[in-house]
Amino acid sequence: MKRDSNRNLVRKRADDSDSDDYNTFAGLEKDSGPEEMSSLSFGAIRNAQKNLDKENEDDSDSDSDSGPEENSGGYERSSYKGNNKGKGNNKEDGGPKKRLKHAPSEASSKKRVSVIRPIPGLTMTKSGADSASRDSKLYRDIRFDATYGKANEDRVREDYAFLDEYRREEIAELQAKLKKTEESYIRSQIQTQIQSLQSKLKTLEKRDFRKKVLNEHRQQQREQAKDGKNPYYLKRSDQRKLVLTEQFKTMKKKDIDRAIERRRKKITGKEKKDMFSGRD
């Protein structure tokens, strides 16, 4: 106890000496000149400086506790951290209130608008959502959906047979336009369009001819079945031969020779390919 009392006494004397040095330094700073200031010891100057720094800190703490100051512009000045920390938490400070249940939804204006828009009547599938929707089709159209079965090609051909006449008219217009055009680039584009339309029209005509030949053969077999004879239904290879034979009957000799030569080259190329692949 005696030792603690001695320590407290020493601290009190040290504080008194510091305060005396500070008072002396402050009085000399106000009333004396530089000659009297130079007579002070370094210890007294240091202690006085510590007391001044402590007073400045106390003043700054009292200013911050008193509230935000108003600058010359008329708005409140506060720290950035304080504003962010209290944002949305203090309802008394005018922060954002809780959203109402039936309030309209808000969307960010920075979000990009999707290129793919919803189409009424079509269900949009999200890829990766489930195993059934993991395909390249984004929209499902019931007209071309495989789950509804295969399309009736014969019925489709009958319903849209009138388009052949439009294709022929378009080919005639493009051919007339080709005669008037002199630029090579535009001519090549027109020729490509003409070849595409002619190829499509030729494919449809071949399909119609094949269907006609096979229907006639089936009709003959039905009539023979009515007469008591056994019907004979052709295999696919026999169907191709029958269609090819009937096709040659309708062609000219020049076209037949050209078709035979083309077919001979095709078969020869296939045989050569099979021969070289067999060596490997």
UniProtKB/Swiss-Prot annotation:
Principal location class: nucleus
One Pfam family from the record: RRP36
Location of the protein in the cell: Nucleus, Nucleolus
GO cellular component: 90S preribosome; nucleolus; small-subunit processome
Location of region: Disordered: 1-135, 214-238, 261-280
Entry coiled-coil feature ranges: 165-208
Keyword hit for Nucleus: yes
Segments of skewed composition (Acidic residues): 55-68
Signal peptide location: none
Domain of life: Eukaryota
Entry-linked InterPro entries: RRP36
Keywords carried by this UniProt record: Coiled coil, Nucleus, Ribonucleoprotein, Ribosome biogenesis, rRNA processing
One BP annotation, GO: maturation of SSU-rRNA from tricistronic rRNA transcript (SSU-rRNA, 5.8S rRNA, LSU-rRNA)
Similarity-based family: Belongs to the RRP36 family.
Role noted for this protein: Component of the 90S pre-ribosome involved in the maturation of rRNAs. Required for early cleavages of the pre-RNAs in the 40S ribosomal subunit maturation pathway.
Self-association state and partner proteins as the record states: Associates with 90S and pre-40S pre-ribosomal particles.
Protein name: rRNA biogenesis protein RRP36
Originating organism: Yarrowia lipolytica (strain CLIB 122 / E 150) (Yeast)
Organismal lineage: Eukaryota, Fungi, Dikarya, Ascomycota, Saccharomycotina
